[in-house]
Amino acid sequence: MYEILSKETLAQSITKFVVRAPYVARKHKAGNFIILRVNDHGERIPLTIVDSDPKEGTITIIAQTIGKTTKLLSLQEKGDFLLDVAGPLGNPTPIHNYGTVVCIGGGVGTAEVYPIATALKNAGNKLITIVGARTKELVILEKELREISDEFNVTTDDGSYGMKGLVTNALDNYLKKDGSVKAVYAIGPIIMMKAVSEFTRPIGLSTFVSLNPIMMDGTGMCGACRVSIGKETKFACVDGPEFDGHQVDFEELMTRNRSYMDLEKVSLEAFDQELAGHRCKAEAKEAANA
């Protein structure tokens, strides 16, 4: 069992947890993830390790409420215990001193960018960070990323904060004034990673993306996380999660990731109804005892 030591709401439907997991904390490197299960009835979900403290034996994870399991996770509180935390899984991010590197985070993908950006900065790189979100309230980890970045940019779809537009617009602006960028790391919604990869392909700028397809065991046994990379089949959990963005078949990835969206929506709606029923019973009992 893994104790939740702290919980913080970062934005609507986005929650940060610090969890006691000594082994994972000791072994964690940037790019690693865990497979988490809240309880006996919960499904297994992959989450990136955002940070770790080997001395304290803790890891930090950030989850966005999308389906039933992430909703269940969001309801956990400080002092509660998670049933399973398996990891660290996946290959660590290869860290090099490129000179100048751009890290791009979209939505909750910003949480995955943070440990990689930190490692790249510690390796001596000039770090340019771009964070994109739909609106100001959904921008996360701004303070943390500003502290390690040589230049920090925000884009929002609605223009409520930073530059109105897409992360590719901000990337284009930066590349026009600095041609020394040697690599781009882009993590976020598939459509965003695809757009960044398509933007950098014609100019031959190395671009790395982190893929989070449907995943169950995290060890390559189930094959659910298979992705097409340069016409070869790879497994994101053991061959990734990071790949050359110019080699990823994003169309196939988007199709596969939509496979269970309808079922996920139905499951979440049923869970919300169940929670509402429990609240009604609790309120009725409280009223009866008043």
Annotate each language-model stretch with its function.
Residues 1-78:
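Ferredoxin-reductase
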Residues 6, 51, 154-156, 209, ...:
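Structural signal for conserved beta-strand scaffold positions within catalytic alpha/beta enzyme cores
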Residues 36, 84-85, 227:
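A generic structural signal for residues embedded in beta-strands
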Residues 39, 87-88, 230:
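Short, surface-exposed secondary-structure boundary micro-motifs
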Residues 42-51, 89-96, 237:
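Short, Lys/Arg- and Gly-enriched loop/turn segments at beta-strand edges
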Residues 71-216:
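FNR/FR-type flavoprotein reductase catalytic core
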Residues 112, 190-191, 212-242, 275-284:
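Local cysteine-cluster metal-coordination motifs and their immediate loop/turn environment
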Residues 235-239, 243-290:
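Short Fe-S-cluster ligation motifs
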